[in-house]
Amino acid sequence: KSPEALEEILWESFFADLHNDNIENILPENTQNKEFSQFYFQHINKLLLARSSKRYVTKANYNITRLHYLLKLNNSSKAIIMVRDPVSHINSIVRQDRIFSESHRKNPKTKHFMHMSGHYEFGLDKKLINIDVEKFTKIQKQFNTGNDIKAWAMYWSMVYNYAKSLIEQLPKSNVMLCRYEDLCNDPKNFFCQSILFFCPLFLVGLHI
C-alpha cells in the first residue's frame, strides 16, 4: 500500500484548471500564485512542527507537471521519478482502472470520495494529465473507441517522454530517475545507495 499525502486538495483550491483536460496541465516556472505559495509552505511547516520533523515527503503523481514551478518555489527540493517496465506498468494500470470502474458502478459514493480527495487517475470519470494537447486528443480517441490498452500505452509514452525531458532540463541535484525494478529487487541497497544520498536523508539522522 502507498501512503497518499492528499496534497492535490490544496493544489485544486488555488489552481482551477489543473484537471481541465481540454488544456495542457503543466505549471511552468513563471507561474505566479502568491496566495498558494504562502499557504503551501505554511501547511508544510505546520506538519513538520506537529510531527517534530525536519523533512517533508509527498507522493504525488500529478507533481510531475509542476516540477519547474516547485523548484522555483524551493530550489532545494528533491524529486524522485520512478519508471517501470512499460509492459508490466500498463498491465497494472489497466487492472487498477477496471477495479475502480467496477467499484464506481457498484457504489457511486466511491467515485465522489476519489474526487473529493483529488484522485482522478482511474475509474469511470478519470481525468488524465494533459501534457500535450495533440497527443492527449489521440489518447482520448482510443479510450472513446474502447481501445483501453492502446490508450494507456500511448499515455505512458507521453508521460515518460515528458519525464525524460525534465531529467535533461533540470539540475541533477534536484531530480533523479529511478527504476522501479531496481527498488523491488534490492530495496535496502537501492535506498542506501540512491535515495539516501540524493535527498540526502543521512543529514537528518535516518538509519536503516
Positions of PLM-derived features:
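PAPS-dependent sulfation machinery
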Residues: 1-56
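N-terminal cationic-hydrophobic initiation segments that often serve targeting/anchoring roles
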Residues: 48, 71, 167-171
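Short catalytic-loop micro-motif centered on adjacent basic/acidic residues
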Residues: 55-59, 177-179
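Active-site glycine/GP-rich loop and adjacent strand/helix microenvironment
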Residues: 57-60, 86, 93, 149-156, ...
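Conserved phosphate-donor/acceptor-positioning beta-strand/loop module used by diverse small-molecule
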Residues: 59-61, 70-95
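Short alpha-helical
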Residues: 64-65, 88, 185
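PAPS-dependent sulfotransferases, especially Golgi type II membrane carbohydrate sulfotransferases
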Residues: 101-208
